[in-house]
Amino acid sequence: MWFFKVGALLFLAALVSANNATTGPKVLCYYDGQMSLREGLGKITVTDIELALPFCTHLLYGFAGVNPETYRLKALDESLELDSGKGQYRLATTLKRRYPNLKVLLSVGGYKDLAEEKPFEKYLTLLESAGSRTAFVNSVYSTLKTYDFDGLDLAWQFPQTKPKRIRGWTGKVWHGFKKLFTGDSVLDPKADEHREEFTALVRDLKNALVADNFILGLTVLPHVNESIFMDVPLLKDNLDYVNLASFDQQTPERNPKEGDYTAPIYEPSERVEGNNVDAEASYWLKQGTPAGKIVIGIPTYGRGWKLVEKSGITGVPPIPADGPSIPGPHSGINGFYSWAEVCAKLPNPGNANLQGADQPLRKIGDPTRRFGAYAFRIPDENEEHGIWLSYEDPDTAGNKAAYVKAKGLGGISIFDLGNDDVRGACAGDKFPILRAAKYRL
């Protein structure tokens, strides 16, 4: 009899373990496949990200796009991603052979598929026709089956909200008074229709994918007003997760004259209301989304502004600035720095005595664990080499994971693996932001 009791207990323990593996915190890890096209140390291949995968529950390959004529899902670089070329889709999904618990999803949109004129038009036009939606859904199903993906991440592109200036109390009152006469600008004249049509698209996708157990998730991109474009009560039951990209709240492209925290957990004093992790998570919770479906995005990079004389010497944000700072040496994007590039600018034995553009930045941590870290270097007498940098590091990433755990949310997402310290150049550990966040869940 004892044998059967022990056997039953072991069976139950196995069931609990399997259930925990399925329902435990999600760690969604994005990989931008086009990073494999870079040169030098900025080149990040599928092989380079393998050491991160034991810490990820899902790998999201980004990004696919939409064909503007047929409204079918398309690879943004067929020669790189399809089997007829280098087959990078297949390289990503075959990782499951070595990491059998890993789910590999294809992400569509993500601000990678923008036309120069009317950048969001095809994503909105697709929604407006049942025939276009059907063509898209069918092409999604075909692509997932062909390349052995486990599901789809909808990083759908909607018109972005306009940048807002940071105003004090007096400025807010005056701005509100002016709006009585000028009114609000219209983001999308057909927003109500697009809201209903996006709900229909998600429902159609779910119906097409559910029989094959495909995962369907939604990523809410930065500067997308979900209260305008997303009917949360109708969407939530058709989604396996809702991933909130709660970062890039301020960027040097959108806010060139004002540097500030790019990804605070809570709202700093006298800032734009809602531009923080807690506000976005609270919105989805209040709309009835199960906490276990909400995933919080964590960037692996920083944003930099150029400082000038009028920026002052304190470095305290919000700080006057003059557009993006110079590009990082490997990412090559104005005002953008991977964590490895950020780390190289912070004080270390190798740069302690350097001057000019190589002089280390002054690092300001976040003892409150609410707003994030920043670093800066005031300009010299010629107004050169000044920089203000808001960034994510392992400590702040861990704070966000702790927030997720305390709130009982569904997990975290890493944007993205290629901008973490892939080679361990900073402190020897590879993927330190991912690791720090994972350990705090």
Curated annotation (Swiss-Prot):
Keywords: Disulfide bond, Glycoprotein, Secreted, Signal
Additional observations: Immunization against the protein decreases early inflammatory responses in the skin of mice bitten by mosquitoes infected with Zika virus and partially protects susceptible mice from lethal Zika virus infection.
Annotated compartments: Secreted
GO terms under biological process: carbohydrate metabolic process; chitin catabolic process
Domain of life: Eukaryota
Disulphide connectivity of cysteines: 29-56
SMART domains documented for this protein: Glyco_18
Knocked-out gene: effects: RNAi-mediated knockdown reduces neutrophil recruitment in the host skin after mosquito bite.
GH18 domain boundaries: 25-441
GO molecular function: chitin binding; chitinase activity
Function comment: Promotes recruitment of host neutrophils at the bite site. Induces expression of IL1B and IL6 in the skin of the host. (Microbial infection) Enhances Zika virus replication and exacerbates disease pathogenesis in the host.
Designated name of the protein: Bacteria-responsive protein 1
Species this protein is from: Aedes aegypti
Key word Signal present: yes
Glycosylated residues (UniProt): 20, 225
Protein family per UniProt: Belongs to the glycosyl hydrolase 18 family. IDGF subfamily.
A GO-annotated cellular component: extracellular region
Tissue: Salivary gland (at protein level).
Signal sequence residues: 1-18
